From Swiss-Prot:
The keyword Phosphoprotein does not apply. Belongs to the ABC transporter superfamily. Sulfate/tungstate importer (TC 3.A.1.6) family. Part of the ABC transporter complex CysAWTP involved in sulfate/thiosulfate import. Responsible for energy coupling to the transport system. This is Sulfate/thiosulfate import ATP-binding protein CysA. Residues 3-237 form the ABC transporter domain. It catalyses: sulfate(out) + ATP + H2O = sulfate(in) + ADP + phosphate + H(+); thiosulfate(out) + ATP + H2O = thiosulfate(in) + ADP + phosphate + H(+). GO terms for cellular component: ATP-binding cassette (ABC) transporter complex. PANTHER family: SPERMIDINE/PUTRESCINE IMPORT ATP-BINDING PROTEIN POTA, SPERMIDINE_PUTRESCINE IMPORT ATP-BINDING PROTEIN POTA. SUPFAM superfamilies: MOP-like, P-loop containing nucleoside triphosphate hydrolases. Its EC number is 7.3.2.3. The keyword Protein biosynthesis does not apply.
Length: 372
């Protein structure tokens, strides 16, 4: 089932949860709604499900206006963060519940229900737990049972509201890989809400980044990470360094002067004729680093702290011309080979930068990093 959200607005008192949001979700696609708490992603999910009503705008399901359609008529399966399993029912009865409460004319026979539940438990690889009760299961097992229960009624749309948020990191990683494989088998149009950037980038076909009730960017995981459309997206998806400077137009293109260093601005960046001050965004792994030598090109820094985190060394550097901190990530082998020591003077050179106008870049990136 395809879904179209057209100019949807939702307010709670004076708070605008969704502000004229328009989106299109293609049939059979797994889409992540990503953003900080309060950005409107869960509200949007609930409006699509029919659990909330928009103050303005339209929801189209397969091209038909479903704005006034009851939740039971939308053929939606919903999975919440906190399982919502019935503790007094076995795993089997929990999965069968949606089938048993259907109107008599639509209710399958007992034999059909048993066959359907058995097939679903095999699909989620938990058929051996059919006679157990929810308190006897792990968190990951309970969430898979909740998903099987949602699938039992054969929804045309599957909505997941932070389904792995209550689980520990290792179980979450295992379950999101499992969800991706399950989706590839079923091809049900699926939307899942998350504030976990890694989860969204790993699982989804498409990512919708939201902030303050509006859509910042829609695209593939690769597109939103490598070509962020706004400073907020850049700051929310992973760590980022900000280099404030003065723009200058030249024959070979624009240049951003950061202290005594000139950084080339990639084509398509901020127009130097329209903006004087700008900010360059650079990710920690996109910075070259070497020991300082007279005449060396780059931004002089002092190594303040080095942390080794598995296969990566995280360096905290302080610019010598200001108190600004620069973060650099290096493969652990390169860090050890260079033999860098705390207190040493070094030079950094950004390899890949994205430039935004001064006010736009600083304000939105700071908000994104605080939210992340």
């Amino acid at each position: 089932m395809s879904i179209q959200v057209q100019h949807v607005t939702k307010r709670f008192g004076n708070f605008v949860a969704l502000d004229d949001v328009s989106l299109a979700f293609r049939q059979g696609e797994l889409t992540a709604l990503l953003g900080p708490s309060g950005c409107g992603k869960t509200t949007l999910l609930r409006i699509i499900a029919g659990l909330e009503h928009a103050d303005a705008g339209t929801i189209l399901l397969n091209g038909e206006d479903a704005s006034d359609r009851h939740v039971r008529e939308r053929q939606v399966g919903f999975v919440f963060q906190h399982y919502a399993l019935f503790k007094h029912m076995t795993v089997f009865e929990n999965v069968a519940f949606g089938l048993r409460v259907k109107p008599r004319a639509q209710r399958p026979s007992e034999a059909q229900i048993r066959a359907k539940v058995k097939a679903l438990l095999e699909l989620v690889q938990l058929d051996w737990l059919a006679e157990r009760y929810p308190p006897q299961l792990s968190g990951g097992q309970r969430q898979r049972i909740a998903l099987a229960r949602a699938l039992a009624v054969e929804p045309r749309v599957l909505l997941l509201d932070e389904p792995f948020g209550a689980l520990d990191a290792k179980v979450r990683k295992e379950l999101r890989r499992w969800l991706r494989r399950l989706h590839d088998d079923l091809h049900v149009t699926s939307l899942f809400v998350t504030h976990d950037q890694e989860e969204a980038l790993e699982v989804a076909d498409s990512v919708v980044l939201m902030n303050r009730g509006q859509v910042e960017q829609v695209g593939s995981p690769d597109a939103v990470y490598n070509t962020p459309a706004t400073p907020f997206v850049y700051g929310f998806l992973g760590n980022v360094n900000l280099f404030h400077g003065r723009l200058e137009a030249g024959e070979g293109g624009s240049v951003l002067h950061v202290g005594e260093t000139a950084l080339s601005v990639p084509p398509g960046g901020v127009d130097a004729s329209r903006a004087d001050q700008a900010v360059a965004f650079v990710r920690p792994h996109e910075i070259d680093l070497e020991r300082y030598a007279p005449g060396a090109e780059g931004i002089p820094v002092t190594l303040r702290r080095a942390l080794t985190l598995g296969a990566v060394a995280q360096l905290e550097l302080e610019r010598t011309d200001s108190d600004d901190i620069i973060e650099v990530s290096l493969p652990i082998e390169r860090f050890r080979a260079q033999g860098l020591r705390e207190g040493e003077t070094l030079v950094v050179r950004p390899r890949a930068i994205r430039v935004f106008a001064q006010g736009q870049g600083s304000e939105h990136a700071a908000a994104a990093q605080a939210a992340a």
